[in-house]
């Protein structure tokens, strides 16, 4: 009989105390060098020590300890400082529907914490290196979880970095492929990157993934800024030729803006999984954790309550890192969360999208079933499949064409997911759901129906936000996006060459379906350095208040604001080569005061907007 069978029999004996069980458990595991070492710090606290001798058994270890401790026990999973490699073959497969990501299933999860409270994962300064396409770490349906002291990275990123060697103008481009990139010319004559992993005890290999990248971001070699006025590149590698020594000639890649020495992060728009996934969890604390690369966002949290980030970084490995990019999408993203989101002392750099985005999700009204019942749906292709609301949640309604919020508010009585299975049967499970049948406590106004496009916002799942003492630099698109009606404070941050807008307040019931009018926001004591070197969506000024409103002339109310000091922008320092500082649309209550502006000649003015402050349908402006 093996140790595991002995253990199971021992725990079947009646009358054995918890402490006695732990002592026997420790003795049995010490007799097997491949087993976890469980050290009883006290009756109610357990330490699980992980090193490279047992890391492949991590999921079994977690499950075993989870089954043997009570819900109030505090558990520490402690890694000996080292490099730990995680492979798809050893991963847990899960059907996770992740907001603002591709909904391909299943996800291959490296470290999976589900239905567990009072647990700490301490990496001890370790590197967690992932291979293939994986979701590195998931925290699901758990409370009081702490993550600290580790880094997440991938051995072979799906973004391919190259350096421009010669720009031949109309005759194409010669580029050098960086040494860590696995590449080939595929059967259609395109440059292709890939990763092969061994299968079946190394009897054969398969392509875990392969891409022919068609877009990219250009970085200056010396200072790592995104190249001025380049935005998203179009890359055509058809008929590429191998010149040897990792140099290739692409006759159809033509772009006069790319000079020799330019670093290009060649990419696709795919985003299958974030680095860290938080779902339906309460009180999550992340400290001293780095994400160096993920094929989605650095951290994605959905339907969570209270998240604290302190020293969470999406960053390069220092000034000498040969890579110029980090994550494929946002550094951090919070969808349909509540409680307090606190993000402090972070470094967010070189990602392919925003540093932080906080928002809810609009459902679209598809059918009025009766005076208290609606059929509603998720609309964006990357946001569906997960729970949207609960009985008792407060909701409001917005007319999509004008982003006019109705005075009517209601409360959910019942909400049921609706989806059709492969055999044509209706299934009310939340997983994979795109539509909901929602009944309400009060009768709905007659105007809410499918004849006019309406969205529903869940007011119960909106957070307070503190974003403080962070550095955001050298990234694509924008810096910080806030879309919550609750108190939001953005202060003492440095936005350094964010390439697009530094701060965006949006609200969109027509494209992204990201909800949240801003009612109580302070932006103060931040430094903005040379934003707007490139043009991206919604980037009308350094600070852009830009709800997506197809027909603003239909508005009778305002989307953002609602009191005289709803949005306060004060005591900031704008260091800029261009003109626009603030753009605002559909706001009631805006204060812009005591801000300092320093002009420079670092770049030529680029922006179409040459007004310092440009306002469109704004009421109650105080300077």
Where are these regions (language model features)?
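Short linear motifs centered on Gly/Pro in flexible linkers and helix caps
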Residues: 5, 9-10, 28, 40, ...
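Intrinsic disorder
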Residues: 34-35, 39-42, 420-423
């Amino acid at each position: 009989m093996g140790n595991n069978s002995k253990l199971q029999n021992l725990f079947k004996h009646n009358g054995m105390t918890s402490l006695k069980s732990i002592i026997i458990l420790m003795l049995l595991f010490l007799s097997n060098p491949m087993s976890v070492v469980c050290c009883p710090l006290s009756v109610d606290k357990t330490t699980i020590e992980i090193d490279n001798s047992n890391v492949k058994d991590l999921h079994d270890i977690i499950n075993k300890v989870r089954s043997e401790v009570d819900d109030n026990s505090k558990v520490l999973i402690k890694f000996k400082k080292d490099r730990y490699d995680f492979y798809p073959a050893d991963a847990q497969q899960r059907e996770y529907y992740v907001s603002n990501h591709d909904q391909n299933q299943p996800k291959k999860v490296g470290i999976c914490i589900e239905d567990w409270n009072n647990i700490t994962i301490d990496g001890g300064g370790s590197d967690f290196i992932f291979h293939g396409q994986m979701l590195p770490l998931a925290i699901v349906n758990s409370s009081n979880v702490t993550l600290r002291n580790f880094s997440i990275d991938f051995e072979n990123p799906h973004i391919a970095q190259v350096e421009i060697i010669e720009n031949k103008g109309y005759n194409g481009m010669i580029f050098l492929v960086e040494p860590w990139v696995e590449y080939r010319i595929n059967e259609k004559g395109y440059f292709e990157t890939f990763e092969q992993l061994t299968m079946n005890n190394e009897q054969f290999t398969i392509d875990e993934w392969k891409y022919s990248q068609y877009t990219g971001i250009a970085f200056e070699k010396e200072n790592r800024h995104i190249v001025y006025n380049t935005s998203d590149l179009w890359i055509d590698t058809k008929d590429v030729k191998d010149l040897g020594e990792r140099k290739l000639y692409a006759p159809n890649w033509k772009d006069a803006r790319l000079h020799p020495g330019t670093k290009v992060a060649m990419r696709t728009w795919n985003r299958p999984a974030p680095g860290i996934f938080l779902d339906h969890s309460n009180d999550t604390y992340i400290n001293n954790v780095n994400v160096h690369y993920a094929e989605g966002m650095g951290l994605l949290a959905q339907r969570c309550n209270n998240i604290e980030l302190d020293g969470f970084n999406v960053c390069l490995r220092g000034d000498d890192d040969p890579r110029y990019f980090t994550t494929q999408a946002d550094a951090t993203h919070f969808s349909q969360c509540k409680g307090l989101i606190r993000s402090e002392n972070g470094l967010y750099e070189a990602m392919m999208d925003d540093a932080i985005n906080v928002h809810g999700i609009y459902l679209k009204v598809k059918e009025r079933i009766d005076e208290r019942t609606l059929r509603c749906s998720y609309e964006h292709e990357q946001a569906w499949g997960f729970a949207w609301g609960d009985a008792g949640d407060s909701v409001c309604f917005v007319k999509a064409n004008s982003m006019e919020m109705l005075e009517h508010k209601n409360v959910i009585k019942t909400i049921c997911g609706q989806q059709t299975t492969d055999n044509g049967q209706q299934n009310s499970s939340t997983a994979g759901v795109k539509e909901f049948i929602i009944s309400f406590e009060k009768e709905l106004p007659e105007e809410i129906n499918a004849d006019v496009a309406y969205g529903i916002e869940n007011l119960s799942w909106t957070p307070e936000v503190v974003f403080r003492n962070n550095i955001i630099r050298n990234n694509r698109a924008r810096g910080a996006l806030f879309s919550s009606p609750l108190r939001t404070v953005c202060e003492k941050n440095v936005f350094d060459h964010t390439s697009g807008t530094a701060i965006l307040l949006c609200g969109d019931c027509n494209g992204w379906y990201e909800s949240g009018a801003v009612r109580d926001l302070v932006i103060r004591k931040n430094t903005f350095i040379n934003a707007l070197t490139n043009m991206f969506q919604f980037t009308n000024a350094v600070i852009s208040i830009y709800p997506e409103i197809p027909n603003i002339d239909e508005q009778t109310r305002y989307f953002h604001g609602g009191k005289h000091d709803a949005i306060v922008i004060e005591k900031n320092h704008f260091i800029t080569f261009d003109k626009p500082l603030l753009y605002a649309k559909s706001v009631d209550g805006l204060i812009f005061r005591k801000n300092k502006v320093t002009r420079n000649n670092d770049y030529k003015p680029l922006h179409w907007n040459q007004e310092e402050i440009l306002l469109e349908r704004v009421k109650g402006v105080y300077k």
